[in-house]
Amino acid sequence: AINGAWVDQLSFTEVEVNRVASSDLLGLFIGAVLTSFAIGSWSRQNLTYLGIALSITANGLCIHYVDYETTLILRFVAGLGAGFYTAVAVAGLGAHSKPREAFNWMLLAFAISQFLELQLIPHLSMNGIYLFFIATYVVTLPFVRLIPATNPPSATQDTPTESRRPTLLA
């Protein structure tokens, strides 16, 4: 939906739109990889706040800077923030007492958000789209404090090796 808006409202070419979208995804990938290295030593809450700050800042700047080169950089930064944010969420799934149930809830939330996004974004201006992205991060701010700041101890740390059952291969 946003790809069409970049073409229609900002007059980007199809090639430029693909590069901007790829820049966003590259940022997401790099942010997730960086989080995988930092999550053991940094606070999960701080990583989440960093991701939110990067995404809000980049999306806010996208409202004011609409040229291709700047948008390309800002979408990378927004993706980087999304990578931090998403990687902490996925790590939280693994640390949950019921990871399968938590993953199912995350998939449901993702499906609902995608549905709402596809219904709403085609009716928004370019600035409205960026404000929508900002709002999705802002509404999650009160919940960041619920994220454990550090990694919870794993069962393998608490259980002697000889008493652990082998994992099931499925």
Regions found by a protein language model. Give the residues of each.
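Paired small-residue
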Residues: 58, 69-78
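Helix-to-loop junctions at the C-terminal end of transmembrane segments
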Residues: 31-44
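Structural signature of the two symmetry-related core transmembrane helices
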Residues: 46-61
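Membrane-interface helix caps of multi-pass secondary transporters
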Residues: 2-11, 93
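Short hydrophobic/small-residue motifs within alpha-helical transmembrane segments
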Residues: 24-26, 111-112
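Cytoplasmic helix-loop-helix junction between adjacent transmembrane helices
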Residues: 74-108
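C-terminal membrane-cytosol helix-exit motif in multi-pass small-molecule transporters
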Residues: 118-122, 126, 134-156
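Helix-breaking motifs and short loop linkers at transmembrane-helix boundaries and internal kinks
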Residues: 11, 64-69
